[in-house]
Every structure is written in structure tokens, then in C-alpha cells.
């Protein structure tokens, strides 16, 4: 079922029945599996008695993206191309700005459909395309379980204020998505370049070692099936323990839209009691979408609540026992073996354990001479090395370390009333030296 709340017509145009096909402009939901936008596009093509093509604009100037991110993305595109062909749908990838690619193929289209992202640049792309098209552009939201405006009509203060609002909608939106059958395939059309020609020799602005994760829906489905069989119970008990191997590792795939959060939630619910997994997947993740969608300053320290900004500035002159430069932090050259291990995990694998990411961000605040500079450093490192950086979860995760979505705590030096974390807590809760040893082993491989 595709709920009406997921669907928005962006420009009020009517279909052009002279068009040769319907075009789905894929950007945020890079999958053929459980994709509301794709299924809506198939419905549209069938109703207009047209074939369907899918187009993707491969731009080399997405903010802060490097070869690590592009490699994962292209692996996912290769996977979705194969899956779309099995459904009679041709994927066209062109190396140009995403709106330009859509506008090119819209010239011979009857109607256009797209998915939904929440970052400013994604909104700008959609606005640019909608204003230039002579055919309808319909946006279908598929990367959240509850559509953002349905969950809340304002930026929420915390998970505590957001949770009751989203929970009241879950029963209605937690329903399977039926796969449609396309009546007219597009495999014989030749609208654009061959896929491998489009991605061959693609050069990202910055070269970085690939992550240990391979992109694509097929890989995501395999990893998640293993998680349900072997790790779900462990996750419910030990999700915060960086020593345990309990995580689903779905965040990179959710970031690129290569897996559906609705599919994950329904499969996990079928597998057993999993309130902690659903809390992170639905409440925490979709709170980050709420944050980015409604905040005008999600990528800067000014996004913080007034109390957090004020208390950090009240303590800006507090002496730091340790201060580190960006270069020292990036190279994991601090006095703290636990922080160094977390940074190295991110650099080597492309992903950091969630609990360690909280500790990591808190220490950057503690070891930098100004909170605004600390904020920028944390975002820079997160966006550069994390496969799942540069997205709502990443922005919200960094902001949380500085007081976003949290309450005021007892006042102390440097942090003021922002929540504090220290290595004693790591030692008390976990066998944290085993975590350090494991990351050291990765460095030796």
C-alpha cells in the first residue's frame, strides 16, 4: 500500500500523452526492493500505457563525498540495474547534475516520479527540476516509515517528545509494500549511455581507501538475514557494547537508500521481540529526519538549543588539559587509546560503533579550544570517513554530542551543562581494552 501522505505533486502539471515513457528520477532510494517511489512510477506507467525508465544523475560534486562513498554508491547502482532489468525496467546513469539528467530525459516523457531526500542540496535539486518541467513531477517518500510531516509538523525537542507522536502512526504505516508488474518493458529502448560506460573511470574529488562494506541491496539483504538469525537477541542486550559483534550494520545501506527501513522493521518484528532495534531504526533515525527537514542550520553549531549554546559559550575560556589539532585528531594521535581506536575504526572500516561515536564526539569538544571549531571538526571527520556520514543521522549524531536532543546536566568545566562522558565509564561498562585490541588487529591486516 502506498499511503496518500507519502505522495506529493510538486508542480501541478498534467501528463503529456505524447511522451514515449514515464521516467523515475532515482536519487535517494537506490533500490528496486520495497521502494514506494518505484512502485508508484510503475502504477503511473501502467495507467498511461507507457514503459518506465529509471534515471540517475551521477554528480562528482556532492558535498564532502569522496571515492569511498562513490564506490559504495556505484556498487549499489550496479546491483539495482540488475534487479530492475529482471522487472523489465532500464536504468540509465549519466554523469551530470541530477536535475540536468532528469530534465534531459523528461523531454520525451509523459510524467516523472522521484523519491525524497531531506538535505538542503536534495531539496534544491527537486525545486530546480520541478520549476523547469512541463510534465508532472510526483515525489514519493520511501526512506522513512512514517512520512516526516505526518510524524510531526515541527522540529522536535528530543526523542521523548517525538516518540509518542510517531508511535500513534506506526500501525497504519507498518504494512508491506506490494510489488507491481510493469505491463510495457523498456529494455529495448536506447535512451542513454551504457551503464558501464557511464561509471567507468569515474573520478571522485578526493581519493580514499574503500570501506570494508560492499554496496548494494543484495548485500544488505544478506547481512540483515544473518543479523536476524544470529545477532538480534544479542543486539537487544548488548547494542551499546563496542566489544560485542551485535550490530545490524544497516546504516550504510539506509544512508544510500539501498535498503528499506519499512522492510527492516517488519522483518525484525517477525523474528522476535526487538524493542531496542525498532527504537533505533524508527524513533532515533526518523527523529534525525525531523531535525534536518525542519532545521535551517542542521550543519552548524547554531542548530543547538539555546541552553546548550549558552552553556558552551559560558565555558569557552575554561582551560583544557589536552588540546589537539585537526591533523592530530585525524591521525588518531591523542593520549587516549579508546578514542584513537574509535577514530581508527572509522578510518579503516568506514563505520564506527554507535556508542564509541558518542564518546568520540564528546572528546573532540573537550580537546578543542572552541566549541564551534570542535563541532566543525567532528562533522568533517564524520562526513569524510563514515559511509553513513553526510546524512540526517550523521548531522543529528554530531549535534547530540553537543547537547541536541538532550537535556541539561550538572554543570562542569568545558561542557557546562552538556552531558559528559569519560574513559572511566568505558572501563566500568565494557571490556574496552578488547575493543582496542580488535582495532589494532585491523590496522595490522
Swiss-Prot record:
Cofactor: FAD; coenzyme F420-(gamma-Glu)n
GO terms, biological process: photoreactive repair
InterPro entries: Crypto/Photolyase_FAD-like_sf, Crypto/Photolyase_N_sf, DNA_photolyase_2, DNA_photolyase_2_CS, DNA_photolyase_N, Photolyase_Class-2, Rossmann-like_a/b/a_fold
A Pfam family: DNA_photolyase
Residues annotated for DNA binding in this entry: 239
Catalytic activity: cyclobutadipyrimidine (in DNA) = 2 pyrimidine residues (in DNA)
Enzyme class, broadest EC rank: lyase
PROSITE patterns in the cross-refs: DNA_PHOTOLYASES_2_1, DNA_PHOTOLYASES_2_2, PHR_CRY_ALPHA_BETA
SUPFAM superfamilies assigned: Cryptochrome/photolyase FAD-binding domain, Cryptochrome/photolyase, N-terminal domain
Keyword Iron among record annotations: no
Keywords assigned: Chromophore, DNA damage, DNA repair, DNA-binding, FAD, Flavoprotein, Lyase
Annotated Gene3D superfamilies: 1.25.40.80, DNA Cyclobutane Dipyrimidine Photolyase, subunit A, domain 3 (1.10.579.10), HUPs (3.40.50.620)
Annotated function: Involved in repair of UV radiation-induced DNA damage. Catalyzes the light-dependent monomerization (300-600 nm) of cyclobutyl pyrimidine dimers (in cis-syn configuration), which are formed between adjacent bases on the same DNA strand upon exposure to ultraviolet radiation.
Assigned protein family: Belongs to the DNA photolyase class-2 family.
Name recorded for this polypeptide: Deoxyribodipyrimidine photo-lyase
Species in which this protein is naturally found: Methanothermobacter thermautotrophicus (strain ATCC 29096 / DSM 1053 / JCM 10044 / NBRC 100330 / Delta H)
Lineage, broadest ranks: Archaea, Methanobacteriati, Methanobacteriota, Methanomada group, Methanobacteria
Amino acid at each position: 500500500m502506498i499511503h496518500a501522505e507519502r505522495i506529493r505533486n510538486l508542480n501541478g502539471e498534467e501528463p503529456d500523452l505524447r511522451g514515449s515513457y514515464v521516467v523515475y528520477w532515482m536519487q535517494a532510494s537506490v533500490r528496486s526492493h520495497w521502494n514506494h517511489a518505484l512502485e508508484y512510477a510503475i502504477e503511473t506507467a501502467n495507467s498511461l500505457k507507457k514503459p518506465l525508465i529509471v534515471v540517475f544523475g551521477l554528480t562528482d560534486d556532492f558535498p564532502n563525498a569522496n571515492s569511498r562513498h562513490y564506490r559504495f554508491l556505484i556498487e549499489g547502482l550496479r546491483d539495482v540495474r540488475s534487479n530492475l532489468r529482471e522487472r523489465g525496467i532500464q536504468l540509465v546513469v549519466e554523469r551530470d547534475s541530477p536535475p540536468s539528467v532528469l530534465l534531459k530525459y523528461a523531454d520525451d516523457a509523459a510524467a516523472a516520479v522521484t523519491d525524497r531526500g531531506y538535505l538542503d542540496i536534495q531539496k534544491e535539486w527537486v525545486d530546480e527540476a520541478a520549476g523547469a518541467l512541463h510534465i508532472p513531477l510526483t515525489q514519493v517518500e520511501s526512506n522513512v516509515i512514517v512520512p516526516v510531516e505526518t510524524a510531526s509538523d515541527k522540529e522536535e525537542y528530543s526523542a521523548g517528545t517525538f516518540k509518542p507522536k510517531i508511535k500513534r502512526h506506526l500501525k497504519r504505516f507498518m504494512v508491506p509494500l506490494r510489488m507491481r508488474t510493469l505491463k510495457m518493458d523498456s529494455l529495448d529502448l536506447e535512451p542513454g549511455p551504457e551503464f558501464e560506460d557511464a561509471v567507468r573511470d569515474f573520478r571522485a574529488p578526493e581519493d580514499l581507501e574503500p570501506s570494508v562494506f560492499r554496496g548494494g541491496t543484495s548485500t544488505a539483504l544478506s547481512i540483515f538475514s544473518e543479523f536476524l538469525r544470529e545477532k538480534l537477541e544479542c543486539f537487544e542486550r548488548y547494542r551499546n557494547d563496542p566489544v560485542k559483534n551485535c550490530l545490524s550494520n544497516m546504516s550504510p545501506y539506509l544512508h544510500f537508500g539501498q535498503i528499506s527501513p519499512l522492510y527492516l522493521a517488519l522483518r525484525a518484528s517477525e523474528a522476535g521481540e526487538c524493542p531496542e532495534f525498532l527504537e533505533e531504526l524508527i524513533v532515533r533515525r526518523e527523529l534525525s529526519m525531523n531535525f534536518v527537514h525542519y532545521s535551517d542550520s542542521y550543519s552548524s553549531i547554531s542548530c543547538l538549543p539555546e541552553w546548550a549554546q549558552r552553556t558552551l559559550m559560558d565555558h569557552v575560556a575554561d582551560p583544557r588539559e589536552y588540546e589537539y589539532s585537526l591533523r592530530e585528531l585525524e591521525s588518531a594521535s591523542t593520549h587516549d587509546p579508546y578514542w584513537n581506536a574509535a577514530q581508527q575504526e572509522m578510518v579503516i572500516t568506514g563505520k564506527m560503533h554507535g556508542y564509541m561515536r558518542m564518546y568520540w564526539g564528546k572528546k573532540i569538544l573537550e580537546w578543542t579550544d572552541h566549541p564551534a571549531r570542535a563541532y566543525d571538526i567532528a562533522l568533517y571527520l564524520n562526513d569524510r570517513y563514515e559511509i553513513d556520514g553526510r546524512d540526517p543521522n550523521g548531522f543529528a549524531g554530531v549535534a547530540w554530542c553537543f547537547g541536541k536532543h538532550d537535556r541539561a546536566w550538572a554543570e562542569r568545566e568545558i561542557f557546562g551543562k552538556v552531558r559528559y562522558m569519560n574513559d572511566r565509564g568505558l572501563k566500568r561498562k565494557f571490556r574496552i581494552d578488547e575493543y582496542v585490541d580488535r582495532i589494532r588487529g585491523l590496522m595490522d591486516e
